[in-house]
Amino acid sequence: MTELYWRAATDAGSYDGTALISVGQGAVHLRTDLPAGTLENAVATLSWPMAENEKIFMNGYQTWTECPELPKWGRQRGTDHIPKFLLDKYAFDRYGDYHFVRYSKRKGMSHGFSYCYFRSGEHYRLVASLDETPGYTIFYYDAKAAVLRIERDCAGVCHGGSAFAAFDLFFAEGSEDEVFDAWFAALGCRPRTTKKLAGYSSWYNRYQNIDEASMLEDLQGCRALFKPGDLFQIDDGWEAKVGDWLETDPAKFPHGLRPLADAAHESGFLAGLWLAPFVCEKESLLCKNHPDWLLQVDGQPWCCGSNWSSFYALDIDNP
């Protein structure tokens, strides 16, 4: 057993508490009444030693986040080693959590989102979140102090008073299957009963270098490889500009996409199409005609990266 210390606060008051935790305890729910106000933080810490040969995995912020297993004294790299002129040109610091999560330069310091595990051979210790509704659950590990720190990404949110769900955590140990099956069961996740979807996507063969002729050529090849009901998907490169989803590139697809969709259906395949609905590139008509649709930070559109002509996030909270 180890003691977990936790705190939750608004600008009108706070609560400090403790809870006894065992590694394989299962669900732990930390809730308290807080006065109405603006949330300042929700933090939990507990002693969590690692063996020298143990590995740690911290789940990344999103699918482009590099998140390998690390040794006890491994280190996560931020963007501090990238020259500023490259950061400015390619916006490398816009592809992850670099602007809102602190990166330590020390060995043995790591962080991740929603779940983490500690692995010694085939034995796992899992610490995970059961509910991200109140805000992301962020895990920080300090190997030197042997402390696991857990934060709720809730600062600045308005709290109406009374009950606040600071953390809903899950602790498990055992084999990989045992800990993850137990976590998924606690989340209410059930195995999917639908059949797996197989097929073709143009991205991994041609990237953006696609046109009507090349797609018809690839469709012909798919007829010899895939079964009826499989997927034929046209990926990035068909659109005039990212964000202008009602227009095809007139040079690449002068007849639009209907003939290709019809040809895929006639071949017995499902027709798929790639979209990136939450962003638009700088040169798109959407960006030029609807600048008020873009997410603003300090009064300026927030650039998310250098892909295409550079791209911006849409403000999905703006009706």
Where are these regions (language model features)?
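Short, flexible loop/turn elements at secondary-structure junctions
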Residues: 10, 34-36, 50, 154, ...
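Loop/turn elements at helix/coil->beta-strand transitions in domains of secreted/extracellular proteins
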Residues: 195-196, 227-231, 266-272
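The substrate-binding groove and active-site-proximal loops of carbohydrate-active enzymes
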Residues: 197-213, 240-255, 305-319
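Active-site-adjacent "subsite" loops/lids of carbohydrate-active enzymes
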Residues: 204, 273-319
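Acidic/aromatic-lined carbohydrate-recognition and catalytic surfaces
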Residues: 235-290
